[in-house]
């Protein structure tokens, strides 16, 4: 390929696809990655579902000319590093949770229930030593080993989180995202690794749709009103498309923000007032979280687009009112 003229290379994502795409781009070619879901659908419609290498290649060739198709964005080497650190963090957290559950379940089976949320390692070691005769030496030593494993996992998790923080800080977008209340290291690093250049989204709503925080539309043209008399425009539950981890982290960030608002730990502003209004309404808790998470995504999109840090005075104000406010501030100066 090094001797070929610059051309378009289409491919399905595979193991190491982003590194392969980066090497092809270094040779001067353009890379287009097409989701296997689209290839499978094309083969099913045009080749009677007969999956062969030739049919897959023919599908990729035809899908490359589909101007409505959204290809998979190739990730940079730095974004792949962030994804690797995040995967290691989740793996260690999962091991820690499973180990804690195993220790608690074993103690509970022997008649020593441990309350939820409690895992004092010193107390557990003393409990096992005090009842060594009941447990037996083999079970007691195994429980000590498992508790020490939780301690080692805590150290490893803290180390990986520190490395993830250092890697995230190298991204110029991190300082802008970290200024948003509710955006910590994990959602910021996931955003930097998954979303990519914010300029590829025409509006904040497209960013919300990319993450999966918009209603799922199912419009047929029938039944414009529900049984309660409210007009229904075909909007159902949350679409849940896109990256699941980023969506979950945005909702968790919204939960922490709602708790800060409920405890009056944030200054009074239109942004906080809108959240208080939602919390005071009769809407379910999770619907309020999705609303706040979507608002955080819109704010993050605006900050990255204009290169500004978060401001409580500007958040929650429409663009027209904000423009008028900026003009008044300029005249006063």
Question: Which residue ranges define each predicted feature?
Answer:
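Phosphate-backbone recognition surface of nucleic-acid-processing proteins
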Residues: 175-179, 185, 191-281, 285
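Short helix-capping/linker segments at secondary-structure and domain boundaries
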Residues: 67-71, 99-100, 157-158, 196-200, ...
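Short alpha-helix plus adjacent loop in nuclease-associated cores
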Residues: 25, 32-72, 123-131, 224-241
